[in-house]
From Swiss-Prot:
Quaternary structure (record): Homodimer.
Top-rank taxon, per record: Bacteria
GO biological process: protoporphyrinogen IX biosynthetic process
Example of a GO cellular component annotation carried by this entry: cytosol
PROSITE patterns: UROD_1 (PS00906), UROD_2 (PS00907)
A GO molecular function held by the record: uroporphyrinogen decarboxylase activity
Annotated source species: Rickettsia massiliae (strain Mtu5)
Annotated localization: Cytoplasm
Protein name: Uroporphyrinogen decarboxylase
Record-annotated site: Transition state stabilizer: 71
Function: Catalyzes the decarboxylation of four acetate groups of uroporphyrinogen-III to yield coproporphyrinogen-III.
Pathway named in the protein's UniProt entry: Porphyrin-containing compound metabolism; protoporphyrin-IX biosynthesis; coproporphyrinogen-III from 5-aminolevulinate: step 4/4
Amino acid sequence: MKQIINPLKGNDNKIPIWFMRQAGRYLPEYKKVRETTKNFLDFCYDVNKATEVTLQPIKRYGFDAAIIFSDILVLPHAFGWEVDFKENIGPILKQFKSQEDFKYLQINPNDKLEKVYEIIKKVKKELPSPTSLIGFAGSPWTVMSYMLEGKGKQDFKTSKKFIYENKILAEELLNFITEKTADHLINQAKSGVDVLKLFDSWSGVLAEEEFTEFVIEPTKKIVLKVKEVFPKTPIIAFPKGAGLLYEKFIKEVPIDILAVDQMVPLEKMKEWSDKVIVQGNLDPVVLLTNKEIIKEKTYKILQAMKGKNFIFNLGHGILPETPTENVEFLTEYVRLYEEKNSNSTF
């Protein structure tokens, strides 16, 4: 049985564990492969290299799931939008400003996404059983935000101003991204992934009305469309920073697994685990500290979620400066806790 799917099958004894950005710059073996290709997107589309780095954390740590090495911005890039990644800066995109800009978006994707599906098929062949394989996409609001801003920001004033002032155009762009995202996830499932995930990194910048319109509604459309074709494929959603709106999200979006950030109280995670499987939520910065602190913080989460529908993960991605030995210690600690399953002597 696929390890990460155990909670869906009622197996409470297993604590599935994997980490966002588990294949990345904190791994020396990743850096060695990454430095062979200058352009980041070219690296994402290189079938052999992307397969290799997807499998690296599985070989090193034995996580219960591998997540395809890719990026949320391959989607707009595949539809003709200008996307580039600058060293030490991050993504730089052509800025979407008006109706005229739709002419730069193609109706059908180029062959770039086919490379992603080839990577999935190759990883699937090489992935040790019973490790799960996760495919993913950026949620429409987050992808749309990058297009409206032209790069990553913290306040997203440009994006929010745009949706306030250009409701019809914003809805048109949102619908385009929503449709293409659903298709991309369906094609990943067809290629062999076991689980799908939607990353909404910037959902936390929206007020309730806009959160409903730009996060909840498009995510719901995507989930329903995917479930029409793959009703048994679990879907994880991560509306990062949603705060109190996580509850509204759970009520209105028919997901299987809710990923939460480190700001969510453990009591809320316990409460929500009666409705969905909850994934999270160790602060990634904890992995920059020492073993005692890692043990203390991890134990609190494991104790709170003991016997619950739960997947252990971080509240966001592994930081590039994270010591590999700390990731190893954390993984072994979760395994040991699972084995002993005791709140008295452990």
